[in-house]
Amino acid sequence: MILIGVVFTGDPRMQQVFRGNYGKAVRRGGGVPVFLPWKPEHAAFWAKHLDGFLFTGGGDPDPRYYGQSMRPECGTPTPARDEFELALLKAVMDTGKPVLGICRGEQILNVALGGTLIQDIPSQRPEAAGENHRDNEHRYAPDHPARVLPGTLLHSLMGRDELLTNSVHHQAVDTPAPGMRVCALSPAGIVEGIEATDGRFLLGLQWHPEAVAAVEERMQRPFTALVKASKEHKAQH
């Protein structure tokens, strides 16, 4: 049994659909999802006893964690979630266990490891204004292109140079953290994916594959790969 910790999104209106989408993607990949409340004091316990981790989408991380003042366009942070996720990531990094981050999950992974974010794409990267980064209408209908860089883990998983992604965000990775590299880019150069440079399974995706994984086999692959990597790590330790 491979136990995958899945961080709660926190929005009561979205809990059922997010639990369903994320949980079903983990189950289809052969894992058992364990949904994690925002309790920093439990981070070390989860890091020790679970096999892999899925950091989910949600609101904007507090810019102070990456050394910036908050811009007017930045969303209101959720301190409890920031504190829990940063504590959990710190504990997980010490174990070497696999991590997959989706949307906010990619962003908080980058922040936890020392990277920075674009707080608001429309105001800070106007050249990307036409890429529909907050297109809620297309959450379940991939139509946003992303170029997958050759020689990356993501490229080996997806088997394509370009993907059509469903994009619902206004923030993105700016400077990748030390030990992380860009693995996917939008046409305007917005980071759509990051991964570890040392070969361990640390993968962040800016789009929402969980929303379409039930009908698009390729979008299921990151979740299946997370479970596989978690199983392999467990067998080796």
How would you describe each model-predicted region?
Residues M1-L100, V111-A112, I118, P122-M158, ...:
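N-terminal beta1-alpha1 cap of cysteine-dependent amidohydrolase-like domains
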Residues C103:
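Conserved G/P- and acidic residue-centered "switch" motifs that form tight phosphate/ATP-binding loops
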Residues L203-Q206:
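Active-site-proximal beta-strand elements of phosphoester/diester hydrolases
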